[in-house]
């Protein structure tokens, strides 16, 4: 893990079955959306998915594909929480 996660985020990663490589990929390639309260939300919109398909080896892309609904919330450089999107986000 190349990121700093809060205790809450670490627990949510485990509870929600999200591997740490998904969060690494979100940090490196994910789209940043602001929540207008000081936090940033990282997601995998279609443009990012297309970029990943072209940049990652096929086996890594396939492993990541089932986690494209994941998001991470960052505040002051620390991951606050993670989860799976169940509703469409504006702009996606």
Regions found by a protein language model. Name each.
Residues 1-92:
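Ribonuclease/tRNase effector modules and their secretory precursors
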């Amino acid at each position: 893990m190349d990121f700093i996660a809060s205790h809450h985020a670490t627990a949510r990663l485990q509870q929600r079955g999200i591997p740490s490589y998904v969060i690494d990929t979100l940090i490196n390639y994910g789209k940043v959306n602001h929540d207008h309260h000081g936090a940033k939300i990282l997601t995998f919109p279609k443009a990012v998915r297309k970029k990943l398909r072209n940049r990652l080896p096929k086996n890594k892309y396939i492993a990541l594909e089932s986690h494209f609904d994941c998001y991470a919330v960052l505040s002051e450089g620390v991951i606050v929480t993670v989860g799976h999107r169940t509703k469409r986000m504006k702009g996606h």
